[in-house]
Amino acid sequence: MNAQTPTVLDLVRQELRSFAGYSSARSVALTGDLWLNANESAWPNPADSHATMRRYPEPQPPKLRQMLAALYGCLPEQVLIGRGSDEGIDLLVRAVCEPRRDPVLVTPPVFGMYAVSAQLQNAPLIQVPLVDDAAGFHADVPAIITAAQTSRAKLVFLCSPSNPVGAAIPLQQIETILQTLAGTALVVVDEAYGEFSDVPSVVPLLARYPHLVVLRTLSKAHALAAVRIGSVIADAHLVAVLRRCQAPYPLPTPCVSLAEQGLSAAALHVTAQRVAEIRAERERLRAALACLSGVRRVYPSQGNFLLVRFDDAEAAFQALYAAGVVVRDQRAAPQLHDALRLTVGTPEQNTRLLAVLRDIQAVPA
Protein backbone atom coordinates (compact mmCIF):
# COMPACT_ATOMS: atom_id res chain seq x y z
CA MET A 1 0.00 0.00 0.00
CA ASN A 2 1.56 3.29 -1.03
CA ALA A 3 1.91 6.36 1.16
CA GLN A 4 -0.97 8.12 -0.57
CA THR A 5 -3.57 5.41 0.08
CA PRO A 6 -4.46 6.42 3.67
CA THR A 7 -5.32 9.90 2.38
CA VAL A 8 -8.02 8.45 0.13
CA LEU A 9 -9.37 6.04 2.71
CA ASP A 10 -9.37 8.76 5.35
CA LEU A 11 -12.07 10.47 3.28
CA VAL A 12 -14.34 7.45 3.66
CA ARG A 13 -16.70 7.31 6.63
CA GLN A 14 -14.75 5.77 9.48
CA GLU A 15 -17.18 2.93 10.13
CA LEU A 16 -16.99 1.86 6.46
CA ARG A 17 -13.20 1.69 6.11
CA SER A 18 -13.14 -1.85 7.48
CA PHE A 19 -16.76 -2.67 6.58
CA ALA A 20 -16.89 -6.19 5.13
CA GLY A 21 -20.22 -5.83 3.36
CA TYR A 22 -22.36 -8.80 2.35
CA SER A 23 -20.58 -11.98 1.26
CA SER A 24 -22.69 -13.43 -1.53
CA ALA A 25 -22.46 -16.88 -3.07
CA ARG A 26 -20.68 -15.38 -6.08
CA SER A 27 -18.27 -13.17 -4.13
CA VAL A 28 -16.06 -16.15 -3.20
CA ALA A 29 -14.09 -17.78 -6.01
CA LEU A 30 -14.90 -21.50 -5.94
CA THR A 31 -14.55 -24.30 -8.46
CA GLY A 32 -16.84 -27.25 -9.00
CA ASP A 33 -19.31 -28.77 -11.42
CA LEU A 34 -22.25 -29.11 -9.03
CA TRP A 35 -23.33 -25.76 -7.61
CA LEU A 36 -25.64 -26.08 -4.61
CA ASN A 37 -24.48 -23.05 -2.64
CA ALA A 38 -26.93 -20.26 -3.59
CA ASN A 39 -30.38 -21.88 -3.36
CA GLU A 40 -30.89 -21.38 -7.10
CA SER A 41 -33.36 -23.47 -9.06
CA ALA A 42 -32.02 -26.67 -10.58
CA TRP A 43 -34.27 -26.11 -13.63
CA PRO A 44 -34.51 -23.13 -15.97
CA ASN A 45 -37.69 -21.11 -16.30
CA PRO A 46 -39.76 -21.97 -19.41
CA ALA A 47 -39.17 -18.42 -20.65
CA ASP A 48 -35.39 -18.91 -20.39
CA SER A 49 -34.84 -20.46 -23.83
CA HIS A 50 -31.05 -20.57 -23.47
CA ALA A 51 -31.12 -21.81 -19.87
CA THR A 52 -28.69 -19.11 -18.76
CA MET A 53 -30.78 -17.09 -16.29
CA ARG A 54 -31.18 -19.43 -13.30
CA ARG A 55 -27.79 -18.57 -11.79
CA TYR A 56 -26.97 -15.34 -9.96
CA PRO A 57 -24.67 -13.13 -12.06
CA GLU A 58 -21.07 -12.17 -11.34
CA PRO A 59 -21.07 -9.05 -9.11
CA GLN A 60 -18.27 -7.49 -11.21
CA PRO A 61 -17.90 -9.49 -14.46
CA PRO A 62 -14.14 -9.74 -15.18
CA LYS A 63 -14.47 -9.58 -18.97
CA LEU A 64 -16.65 -6.46 -18.93
CA ARG A 65 -14.42 -4.86 -16.31
CA GLN A 66 -11.38 -5.43 -18.52
CA MET A 67 -13.18 -4.05 -21.57
CA LEU A 68 -14.23 -0.90 -19.71
CA ALA A 69 -10.73 -0.42 -18.33
CA ALA A 70 -9.32 -0.65 -21.86
CA LEU A 71 -11.95 1.78 -23.13
CA TYR A 72 -11.26 4.39 -20.45
CA GLY A 73 -7.49 3.94 -20.10
CA CYS A 74 -7.20 2.63 -16.56
CA LEU A 75 -6.63 -0.63 -14.67
CA PRO A 76 -9.48 -3.12 -14.14
CA GLU A 77 -9.12 -2.80 -10.36
CA GLN A 78 -9.78 0.94 -10.74
CA VAL A 79 -13.24 0.29 -12.23
CA LEU A 80 -16.46 -0.31 -10.34
CA ILE A 81 -19.35 -1.21 -12.64
CA GLY A 82 -22.78 -0.08 -11.50
CA ARG A 83 -26.35 0.53 -12.59
CA GLY A 84 -25.61 3.70 -14.51
CA SER A 85 -23.68 6.66 -13.15
CA ASP A 86 -26.61 7.26 -10.79
CA GLU A 87 -25.58 4.31 -8.64
CA GLY A 88 -21.98 5.51 -8.58
CA ILE A 89 -23.10 8.94 -7.36
CA ASP A 90 -25.24 7.39 -4.64
CA LEU A 91 -22.48 5.03 -3.48
CA LEU A 92 -19.97 7.86 -3.25
CA VAL A 93 -22.27 10.04 -1.16
CA ARG A 94 -23.20 7.19 1.17
CA ALA A 95 -19.61 6.00 1.59
CA VAL A 96 -18.07 9.42 2.18
CA CYS A 97 -20.62 11.71 3.84
CA GLU A 98 -21.76 11.47 7.45
CA PRO A 99 -25.40 12.62 7.64
CA ARG A 100 -25.83 16.21 8.79
CA ARG A 101 -22.07 16.72 8.87
CA ASP A 102 -20.15 16.25 5.61
CA PRO A 103 -21.15 18.62 2.78
CA VAL A 104 -21.50 17.89 -0.92
CA LEU A 105 -20.59 20.70 -3.32
CA VAL A 106 -22.36 21.13 -6.67
CA THR A 107 -22.30 23.77 -9.42
CA PRO A 108 -25.84 24.59 -10.60
CA PRO A 109 -27.39 24.57 -13.08
CA VAL A 110 -26.25 20.95 -13.24
CA PHE A 111 -27.39 17.32 -13.30
CA GLY A 112 -29.82 16.91 -10.42
CA MET A 113 -28.79 13.51 -9.06
CA TYR A 114 -25.84 14.92 -7.11
CA ALA A 115 -28.21 17.01 -4.99
CA VAL A 116 -30.78 14.20 -4.77
CA SER A 117 -28.20 11.77 -3.40
CA ALA A 118 -26.95 14.38 -0.93
CA GLN A 119 -30.50 15.02 0.29
CA LEU A 120 -31.21 11.30 0.67
CA GLN A 121 -28.07 11.02 2.82
CA ASN A 122 -29.03 14.19 4.72
CA ALA A 123 -25.68 15.69 3.75
CA PRO A 124 -25.42 19.50 3.64
CA LEU A 125 -25.53 20.83 0.07
CA ILE A 126 -23.15 23.62 -0.96
CA GLN A 127 -23.99 25.34 -4.26
CA VAL A 128 -21.48 27.36 -6.28
CA PRO A 129 -23.34 28.64 -9.38
CA LEU A 130 -21.81 28.45 -12.82
CA VAL A 131 -20.92 31.82 -14.31
CA ASP A 132 -22.83 32.87 -17.43
CA ASP A 133 -20.97 35.45 -19.50
CA ALA A 134 -20.25 36.30 -23.13
CA ALA A 135 -18.28 33.07 -23.61
CA GLY A 136 -21.05 30.90 -22.17
CA PHE A 137 -21.35 29.06 -18.89
CA HIS A 138 -18.19 28.12 -17.02
CA ALA A 139 -17.12 26.91 -13.59
CA ASP A 140 -16.06 29.53 -11.06
CA VAL A 141 -12.89 27.73 -9.94
CA PRO A 142 -11.78 30.20 -7.23
CA ALA A 143 -15.29 30.18 -5.75
CA ILE A 144 -15.42 26.37 -5.84
CA ILE A 145 -12.12 26.12 -3.97
CA THR A 146 -13.08 28.74 -1.40
CA ALA A 147 -16.50 27.19 -0.77
CA ALA A 148 -15.06 23.68 -0.50
CA GLN A 149 -12.43 24.79 1.98
CA THR A 150 -14.77 26.97 4.04
CA SER A 151 -17.52 24.34 4.26
CA ARG A 152 -15.10 21.40 4.56
CA ALA A 153 -16.90 19.66 1.73
CA LYS A 154 -16.09 15.96 1.46
CA LEU A 155 -17.36 15.58 -2.13
CA VAL A 156 -17.02 18.06 -4.98
CA PHE A 157 -19.02 17.15 -8.10
CA LEU A 158 -17.85 18.63 -11.40
CA CYS A 159 -19.87 17.80 -14.51
CA SER A 160 -17.67 18.10 -17.61
CA PRO A 161 -19.16 18.44 -20.17
CA SER A 162 -21.88 19.85 -17.98
CA ASN A 163 -25.50 18.83 -18.28
CA PRO A 164 -27.58 20.89 -19.13
CA VAL A 165 -25.32 23.76 -20.20
CA GLY A 166 -22.80 21.84 -22.34
CA ALA A 167 -19.62 23.48 -21.05
CA ALA A 168 -16.46 21.45 -20.39
CA ILE A 169 -13.91 22.37 -17.73
CA PRO A 170 -10.31 22.70 -18.99
CA LEU A 171 -7.96 20.07 -17.55
CA GLN A 172 -5.72 22.73 -16.03
CA GLN A 173 -8.62 24.10 -13.98
CA ILE A 174 -9.58 20.64 -12.74
CA GLU A 175 -5.96 20.01 -11.78
CA THR A 176 -5.92 23.28 -9.82
CA ILE A 177 -8.94 22.08 -7.85
CA LEU A 178 -7.32 18.68 -7.29
CA GLN A 179 -4.09 20.22 -6.05
CA THR A 180 -5.87 22.54 -3.64
CA LEU A 181 -8.29 19.98 -2.19
CA ALA A 182 -5.84 17.08 -1.82
CA GLY A 183 -6.49 15.29 1.45
CA THR A 184 -9.72 17.13 2.21
CA ALA A 185 -12.24 16.12 -0.48
CA LEU A 186 -12.94 13.66 -3.24
CA VAL A 187 -13.19 15.51 -6.54
CA VAL A 188 -15.69 13.69 -8.77
CA VAL A 189 -15.62 14.52 -12.48
CA ASP A 190 -18.72 13.30 -14.32
CA GLU A 191 -17.72 12.62 -17.93
CA ALA A 192 -21.04 11.16 -19.09
CA TYR A 193 -20.75 13.22 -22.30
CA GLY A 194 -16.97 12.95 -22.62
CA GLU A 195 -17.04 11.20 -25.98
CA PHE A 196 -18.55 14.31 -27.60
CA SER A 197 -15.99 16.72 -26.13
CA ASP A 198 -12.78 18.29 -27.41
CA VAL A 199 -11.42 18.30 -23.85
CA PRO A 200 -9.47 15.12 -23.01
CA SER A 201 -10.56 12.83 -20.19
CA VAL A 202 -9.18 13.43 -16.71
CA VAL A 203 -8.61 9.70 -16.14
CA PRO A 204 -4.80 9.97 -16.65
CA LEU A 205 -4.69 12.42 -13.72
CA LEU A 206 -5.68 9.59 -11.39
CA ALA A 207 -2.04 8.47 -11.34
CA ARG A 208 -1.11 11.72 -9.57
CA TYR A 209 -4.30 12.48 -7.66
CA PRO A 210 -5.75 9.48 -5.80
CA HIS A 211 -8.63 11.64 -4.53
CA LEU A 212 -9.91 12.01 -8.12
CA VAL A 213 -12.99 10.01 -9.12
CA VAL A 214 -14.31 9.82 -12.69
CA LEU A 215 -17.81 8.78 -13.74
CA ARG A 216 -18.44 7.30 -17.19
CA THR A 217 -21.47 5.68 -18.81
CA LEU A 218 -22.54 3.61 -21.80
CA SER A 219 -25.87 5.46 -21.92
CA LYS A 220 -24.96 8.36 -24.20
CA ALA A 221 -22.38 7.88 -26.96
CA HIS A 222 -22.67 4.09 -26.84
CA ALA A 223 -26.49 4.15 -27.15
CA LEU A 224 -27.07 1.64 -24.34
CA ALA A 225 -29.18 3.70 -21.94
CA ALA A 226 -31.56 0.83 -21.15
CA VAL A 227 -28.66 -1.47 -20.29
CA ARG A 228 -27.80 0.77 -17.30
CA ILE A 229 -24.02 0.30 -17.23
CA GLY A 230 -22.00 3.04 -15.59
CA SER A 231 -18.44 3.09 -14.28
CA VAL A 232 -16.77 4.64 -11.27
CA ILE A 233 -13.06 5.04 -12.02
CA ALA A 234 -11.02 5.66 -8.89
CA ASP A 235 -8.17 4.58 -6.66
CA ALA A 236 -8.34 0.78 -6.35
CA HIS A 237 -8.67 0.95 -2.55
CA LEU A 238 -11.63 3.32 -2.83
CA VAL A 239 -13.21 1.08 -5.48
CA ALA A 240 -12.93 -1.84 -3.05
CA VAL A 241 -14.78 0.15 -0.36
CA LEU A 242 -17.54 1.14 -2.80
CA ARG A 243 -17.93 -2.47 -3.93
CA ARG A 244 -18.53 -3.53 -0.33
CA CYS A 245 -21.28 -0.90 -0.10
CA GLN A 246 -22.94 -2.02 -3.34
CA ALA A 247 -25.84 -4.46 -3.68
CA PRO A 248 -24.76 -8.13 -3.99
CA TYR A 249 -25.79 -8.68 -7.63
CA PRO A 250 -26.10 -5.27 -9.30
CA LEU A 251 -25.59 -6.29 -12.94
CA PRO A 252 -28.18 -8.47 -14.73
CA THR A 253 -26.67 -11.04 -17.06
CA PRO A 254 -28.53 -9.81 -20.20
CA CYS A 255 -27.27 -6.27 -19.57
CA VAL A 256 -23.69 -7.47 -19.18
CA SER A 257 -23.94 -9.48 -22.39
CA LEU A 258 -25.28 -6.50 -24.36
CA ALA A 259 -22.59 -4.22 -22.93
CA GLU A 260 -19.85 -6.64 -23.94
CA GLN A 261 -21.26 -6.84 -27.46
CA GLY A 262 -21.51 -3.04 -27.53
CA LEU A 263 -17.80 -2.75 -26.73
CA SER A 264 -16.62 -5.06 -29.50
CA ALA A 265 -14.26 -3.58 -32.08
CA ALA A 266 -17.02 -3.49 -34.69
CA ALA A 267 -19.48 -1.78 -32.35
CA LEU A 268 -16.88 0.77 -31.21
CA HIS A 269 -16.18 1.63 -34.85
CA VAL A 270 -19.87 2.38 -35.43
CA THR A 271 -20.02 4.39 -32.20
CA ALA A 272 -17.07 6.53 -33.30
CA GLN A 273 -18.78 7.24 -36.63
CA ARG A 274 -22.00 8.23 -34.90
CA VAL A 275 -20.21 10.48 -32.43
CA ALA A 276 -18.56 12.29 -35.35
CA GLU A 277 -21.95 12.70 -37.04
CA ILE A 278 -23.53 14.03 -33.84
CA ARG A 279 -20.72 16.55 -33.41
CA ALA A 280 -21.20 17.76 -36.99
CA GLU A 281 -24.98 17.94 -36.58
CA ARG A 282 -24.58 19.77 -33.29
CA GLU A 283 -22.78 22.60 -35.08
CA ARG A 284 -25.27 22.64 -37.97
CA LEU A 285 -28.17 22.79 -35.54
CA ARG A 286 -26.50 25.47 -33.46
CA ALA A 287 -25.91 27.70 -36.48
CA ALA A 288 -29.48 27.25 -37.73
CA LEU A 289 -31.03 27.94 -34.33
CA ALA A 290 -28.95 31.09 -33.91
CA CYS A 291 -30.59 32.49 -37.07
CA LEU A 292 -34.13 32.19 -35.71
CA SER A 293 -35.61 35.49 -34.55
CA GLY A 294 -37.27 33.94 -31.48
CA VAL A 295 -34.01 32.53 -30.18
CA ARG A 296 -32.11 34.70 -27.72
CA ARG A 297 -29.02 32.56 -27.39
CA VAL A 298 -27.62 29.16 -28.32
CA TYR A 299 -24.84 28.10 -26.00
CA PRO A 300 -21.70 26.35 -27.24
CA SER A 301 -21.80 22.68 -26.31
CA GLN A 302 -19.35 19.85 -25.80
CA GLY A 303 -22.20 17.36 -25.33
CA ASN A 304 -24.80 15.77 -27.60
CA PHE A 305 -27.29 18.56 -26.86
CA LEU A 306 -27.75 22.32 -27.05
CA LEU A 307 -29.05 24.71 -24.42
CA VAL A 308 -31.20 27.39 -26.05
CA ARG A 309 -32.76 30.55 -24.62
CA PHE A 310 -36.03 31.67 -26.26
CA ASP A 311 -37.99 34.91 -26.23
CA ASP A 312 -41.00 32.73 -25.41
CA ALA A 313 -39.82 29.34 -24.19
CA GLU A 314 -43.37 28.26 -23.35
CA ALA A 315 -44.56 28.86 -26.92
CA ALA A 316 -41.55 27.01 -28.32
CA PHE A 317 -42.03 24.07 -25.96
CA GLN A 318 -45.76 23.79 -26.69
CA ALA A 319 -45.31 24.10 -30.46
CA LEU A 320 -42.71 21.36 -30.46
CA TYR A 321 -44.84 19.16 -28.23
CA ALA A 322 -47.89 19.66 -30.46
CA ALA A 323 -45.77 18.54 -33.40
CA GLY A 324 -44.69 15.41 -31.54
CA VAL A 325 -41.21 16.71 -30.71
CA VAL A 326 -40.33 16.32 -27.02
CA VAL A 327 -37.49 18.43 -25.61
CA ARG A 328 -36.31 19.06 -22.04
CA ASP A 329 -37.84 22.06 -20.29
CA GLN A 330 -35.11 23.67 -18.16
CA ARG A 331 -37.08 26.69 -16.94
CA ALA A 332 -37.22 25.49 -13.33
CA ALA A 333 -33.42 25.26 -13.11
CA PRO A 334 -31.34 28.12 -11.66
CA GLN A 335 -30.45 30.80 -14.25
CA LEU A 336 -32.46 29.00 -16.97
CA HIS A 337 -35.92 30.61 -16.74
CA ASP A 338 -36.17 30.90 -20.54
CA ALA A 339 -34.24 27.82 -21.68
CA LEU A 340 -34.91 24.47 -23.31
CA ARG A 341 -32.39 21.67 -23.82
CA LEU A 342 -32.46 20.06 -27.27
CA THR A 343 -30.83 16.68 -27.85
CA VAL A 344 -29.00 16.41 -31.18
CA GLY A 345 -30.80 13.77 -33.23
CA THR A 346 -30.34 12.42 -36.74
CA PRO A 347 -30.07 14.96 -39.58
CA GLU A 348 -33.70 14.29 -40.45
CA GLN A 349 -34.85 14.72 -36.85
CA ASN A 350 -32.92 17.96 -36.48
CA THR A 351 -34.41 19.31 -39.70
CA ARG A 352 -37.89 18.47 -38.42
CA LEU A 353 -37.21 20.31 -35.14
CA LEU A 354 -35.98 23.37 -37.03
CA ALA A 355 -39.04 23.35 -39.28
CA VAL A 356 -41.37 23.51 -36.26
CA LEU A 357 -39.45 26.41 -34.76
CA ARG A 358 -39.42 28.27 -38.09
CA ASP A 359 -43.19 27.86 -38.30
CA ILE A 360 -43.53 29.72 -34.99
CA GLN A 361 -41.77 32.69 -36.57
CA ALA A 362 -44.15 32.62 -39.53
CA VAL A 363 -47.23 32.96 -37.31
CA PRO A 364 -48.18 36.65 -36.86
CA ALA A 365 -48.04 37.89 -33.28
Curated annotation (Swiss-Prot):
<comment type="subunit">
    <text>Homodimer.</text>
</comment>
<dbReference type="InterPro" id="IPR005861">
    <property type="entry name" value="HisP_aminotrans"/>
</dbReference>
<keyword id="KW-0808">Transferase</keyword>
<keyword id="KW-0028">Amino-acid biosynthesis</keyword>
<dbReference type="InterPro" id="IPR004839">
    <property type="entry name" value="Aminotransferase_I/II_large"/>
</dbReference>
<dbReference type="GO" id="GO:0030170">
    <property type="term" value="F:pyridoxal phosphate binding"/>
</dbReference>
<dbReference type="Pfam" id="PF00155">
    <property type="entry name" value="Aminotran_1_2"/>
</dbReference>
<comment type="pathway">
    <text>Amino-acid biosynthesis; L-histidine biosynthesis; L-histidine from 5-phospho-alpha-D-ribose 1-diphosphate: step 7/9.</text>
</comment>
<dbReference type="GO" id="GO:0004400">
    <property type="term" value="F:histidinol-phosphate transaminase activity"/>
</dbReference>
<dbReference type="InterPro" id="IPR015421">
    <property type="entry name" value="PyrdxlP-dep_Trfase_major"/>
</dbReference>
<keyword id="KW-0032">Aminotransferase</keyword>
<keyword id="KW-0368">Histidine biosynthesis</keyword>
<feature type="modified residue" description="N6-(pyridoxal phosphate)lysine">
    <location>
        <position position="220"/>
    </location>
</feature>
<comment type="similarity">
    <text>Belongs to the class-II pyridoxal-phosphate-dependent aminotransferase family. Histidinol-phosphate aminotransferase subfamily.</text>
</comment>
<dbReference type="InterPro" id="IPR015422">
    <property type="entry name" value="PyrdxlP-dep_Trfase_small"/>
</dbReference>
<keyword id="KW-0663">Pyridoxal phosphate</keyword>
<dbReference type="InterPro" id="IPR015424">
    <property type="entry name" value="PyrdxlP-dep_Trfase"/>
</dbReference>
<protein>
    <recommendedName>
        <fullName>Histidinol-phosphate aminotransferase</fullName>
        <ecNumber>2.6.1.9</ecNumber>
    </recommendedName>
</protein>
<dbReference type="GO" id="GO:0000105">
    <property type="term" value="P:L-histidine biosynthetic process"/>
</dbReference>
